[in-house]
Regions:
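Conserved N-terminal phosphate-binding loop of PLP-dependent enzymes in the Aspartate aminotransferase
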Residues: 1-419
Length: 419
């Protein structure tokens, strides 16, 4: 067995080896703190494995519930074709937290969740129009500047955060529209002008009758933690109906409680997308669809193997999520996130120097003056806590959903010292 101080040498020998300097101590990490196995230092965890760990490290209830996984851990199950009781329990549980949707597809990886939502939309649009295979490459997807939807397959044509993630790979020239992100404190007139331009660009593309989907992150993550107005979502919703396109919201990062609601789109009254992509805190990735897809009788949920994968998600992840969902309900986690998140946001507003403080629930971010200033502050923060950069000069916080007021106070003390 390797020692903690050997880990990075091994990784650099066989892989790119550019991971974080921390080596996870699985035994000693606790609650909202990640412990470095090399030094024993605890770090306040405000990245939560890129927003994938809702209940923190070694949650006592989750540890107790997961003690029985040995029977399942020794098997790798092809869940798409071989069903089991844990699979059914997971699907039932997941459907319960997404009552707006009727069809579900599960897969490994958020990118593949987005990709299969796109495939479902392409299939639906082609059959709606009565088009042939010869017309397939004429389809379009409306998407935003600064979008991040993944880095393989169709998503390469959507992601446009940093060029090194998509450059030199073949891509489709799909319609990219202006980003009407809100700057805080809100200057409504400025936002409205950009929204109007963005919506005109979207409608121009939709008028070709070749747009299969409008896709956007409910709150953009890597692109800068960018928020959009309810009016903007409502306008896109109306256009998607009018021009027969699917409205797809990418909730891979925002979903399952991070914003204080199960899905971030719930913050926008009356908004109901046709599809959502999910992952991260859901432990299993995929997409969900409303019955709008049933306007085409032989849609992807009616044709065997039209979309599929060998594993259809991992059974251990499914068992874990079933327990996570139960604990979140028992402990009223969503209400906790809303309360603690509001406190966190207000405390961030007291920090000197940082600007554009923004957030919903525990999905929080702030800006520095320049990219160089951001990087310097980031380096200081990483000495005591885990955080993530985003956009050109932003820092994003992705705490575990069990974050407390005391954790917020600790975070604010670290941030004030770092800036």
């Amino acid at each position: 067995m390797f020692r903690p101080d050997q880990v990075h040498d091994v990784m650099k020998r066989h892989t790119i080896g550019d991971g974080e300097p921390i080596v996870i101590d699985f035994e000693k990490s606790f609650g909202t703190h990640l412990v470095d196995a090399k030094t024993g230092q605890p770090f306040l965890d405000c990245s939560s494995q890129f927003a994938s760990m809702p209940l923190g490290w070694n949650h006592p209830k989750l540890k107790e519930k997961m003690e029985s996984i040995n029977l399942y851990a020794v098997h790798k199950i092809a869940n798409s074709d071989y069903y089991s009781v844990p699979l059914a329990e997971f699907v039932h549980t997941f459907a319960g937290i997404a009552p707006d949707f009727n069809h579900f597809f599960f897969v490994e990886g958020g990118t593949l969740g987005v990709e299969n939502a796109l495939k479902a939309a392409f299939d639906w649009k082609m059959k709606k129009l009565g088009l042939s295979e010869a017309d397939a490459n004429s389809l379009d997807v409306v998407h935003l500047e600064q979008a991040f939807h993944g880095r393989s397959g169709y998503t390469l044509s959507l992601t446009n955060t940093f060029a090194n993630k998509t450059a030199l790979f073949p891509k489709f020239n799909w319609s990219r529209i202006k980003n009407p992100k809100i700057h805080f404190p809100l200057v409504e007139s400025e936002t409205t002008v950009v929204e109007e331009l963005s919506l005109r660009q979207a409608e121009d593309a939709l008028k070709t009758n070749r747009v299969a989907a409008i896709i956007l992150e409910t709150i953009q993550g890597e692109g800068g933690d960018n928020h959009f107005s309810s009016e903007y979502f409502a306008a896109l919703r109306k256009m998607a109906f009018e021009y027969e396109a699917m409205l797809i919201l990418d909730e891979v990062q925002t979903g399952v409680g991070l914003t204080g609601t199960t899905w971030a789109y719930e913050h926008h009254a009356g908004l109901r997308p046709d599809m959502i992509a999910f992952g991260k805190k859901a432990q299993v990735c995929g997409f969900a669809s409303t019955t709008r897809i049933d306007e085409v009788p032989d849609n992807v949920f009616k044709q065997s193997s039209r979309i599929n994968s060998t594993w259809g998600g991992n059974i251990i992840d499914m068992i874990r999520f079933t327990h996570i969902a139960q604990i979140m309900k028992e402990d009223d986690i969503l209400n906790r996130v809303a309360i603690v998140g509001d406190y966190f946001l207000k405390q961030l507003l007291t920090v000197p120097r940082i600007t554009n403080v923004r957030g919903k629930g525990l999905m929080l971010a702030f800006d520095l003056e320049t990219p160089e200033a951001r990087n310097a502050v980031l380096d200081n923060l990483l000495k005591r806590m885990t955080v993530l950069p985003c956009g050109e000069r932003s820092i994003r916080l992705r705490p575990h959903l069990i974050f407390s007021m005391a954790d917020v106070d600790e975070a604010i003390e670290i941030i004030k010292h770092a800036v």
